[in-house]
Amino acid sequence: AHVRFLLLFLYALQGTVADLRAFAFSNRLRDVGPPLETLPFDDAMNLILKEVGGGSTDYGQAWQDLYDQHWPLIDGRTTVLVLGDGRSNMTNPRLDLFGELAARAKRVVWLSPEGEGRWGTGDSALLQYRPFCTHLGHAATAADLERAIDEALSAYG
């Protein structure tokens, strides 16, 4: 349910945010901008889930893929918006790369579908990522997402 919600959010942003680049992953990062830009939502979602879904989440590998394939896209004008729970299934969260990402970007906004009480429990690395985030918040509904993004972006100009 959270995946569909997040993909619908990214789909809605296409065409409304200049220079938007959208990526998704479970264990390997994929550029999902082309299907979101060119296909009806259900078709885009099915294709993205086929290409990306099904694996255990590995944030460390996603940061490595971002570094290897798309790092030049991130600079002092970039807002990085991470929509995810930060659960990396006991894999290396690659705080080194996430820290570099945060240093390169203008800001990093992370919105988790899990409430704050679950952050850092079990396989969650969210509290480890927290120091690198300009804003870390909870967003499980469309209203939460809208409020959290408005707060994060207005607070940091």
Where are these regions (language model features)?
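Short acidic, Gly/Ser-rich segments with clustered Asp/Glu that frequently serve as metal-coordination loops
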Residues: 1-5, 29, 86-90
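Exposed acidic/Ser/Thr-rich ligand/metal-binding surfaces
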Residues: 63-107, 137, 148-156
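Von Willebrand factor type A / integrin I
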Residues: 99-157
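A short acidic, amphipathic alpha-helical/loop segment
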Residues: 5-9, 94-100, 125
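A short, conserved beta-to-alpha structural element at the edge of catalytic cores
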Residues: 13-35, 104-123
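An amphipathic, basic-hydrophobic helix/alpha-beta surface used to engage anionic
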Residues: 1-19
